[in-house]
Amino acid sequence: MSDFNLVGVIRVMPTDPDVNLDELEEKLKKVIPEKYGLAKVEREPIAFGLVALKFYVLGRDEEGYSFDEVAEKFEEVENVESAEVETVSRI
């Protein structure tokens, strides 16, 4: 983890409130490219029973790292409505 100097927060919205979040979280973890790390995943209640997953993805401030790349990978996963990079910060 010491090689990483950025953290990007990516909010993933499931397609509906009935999606099994545990299964979705595991599927999403598997599509994160190897060069990135994962600090943690949080759940954020939105409305009407819908809960977003917030992935804290670790990367480097150098060419070849883009948190948008990870968000695009997330959007390809079944039961994902959207994935959006909320913030990127230095660590």
UniProtKB/Swiss-Prot annotation:
Keyword Protein biosynthesis listed: yes
InterPro entries: eEF-1beta-like_sf (IPR036219), EF1B_bsu/dsu_GNE (IPR014038), Transl_elong_EF1B/ribsomal_bS6 (IPR014717), Transl_elong_EF1B_B_arc (IPR004542)
UniProt keyword terms in alphabetical order: Elongation factor, Protein biosynthesis
Superkingdom of the source species: Archaea
SUPFAM superfamilies, per the entry: eEF-1beta-like (SSF54984)
Entries under Pfam families matching the protein: EF1_GNE
GO molecular function: translation elongation factor activity
Signal sequence coordinates: none
HAMAP family referenced in this protein's UniProt entry, alphabetically: EF1_beta
Annotated function: Promotes the exchange of GDP for GTP in EF-1-alpha/GDP, thus allowing the regeneration of EF-1-alpha/GTP that could then be used to form the ternary complex EF-1-alpha/GTP/AAtRNA.
Family: Belongs to the EF-1-beta/EF-1-delta family.
Name of this chain's protein: Elongation factor 1-beta
Organism: Pyrococcus horikoshii (strain ATCC 700860 / DSM 12428 / JCM 9974 / NBRC 100139 / OT-3)
